[in-house]
Amino acid sequence: VTIPAGWALSRKNMPGKKFLMMYFIIPMFFGGGLIPFYNVMSNLGLINTIWAIVLPSILSVWNLFMTKTFFESSVPNGLIEAAKIDGAGHFRTFTSVVLPLAKAILAVMALYYAVGQWNSYFNAMIFLQDESMYPLQLVLKEILIASESTVGGSGETILQQYRLANQLKYVSVIVSSLPVLMLYPFV
């Protein structure tokens, strides 16, 4: 959704461009609040579904402005005019001319959205009650909270529990960071 919207907003002759820009900018700075957000998700029947996690992150306004700026600065108007002369419509121009030139922004947006989804836990914490649907970060949070509690015993036992809890924290951080670290060199 971000790439086509960024392309559309980058066109100088798009009708209603200023209105749409304000439509995106105002909610970016002034959030509507958590309770209305929960009510909307509840009224749409998305509570305890995977869509409660996917749909809110389908468009990032910051990423939209990055793609808009990329298209404004990197796609020459001469190519767009040449495509029009050759008989290409808006969709054909976008898919055949613009997208091949936009591989860099496509890779960056894929990385940003992937890392954002990977690190996301707050929406899952609010909208998911079924623990089998929890993302990795929420499962790791539960493990870390459970490892913090000490049952008691002698000083040596408590020290061993503390060391084990610290090791569990470090392993959790590595496990949750490894896929993203493996992805970065290829983007």
Enumerate the language-model features and the residues they cover.
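A hydrophobic, multi-pass inner-membrane permease signature
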Residues: V1-V187
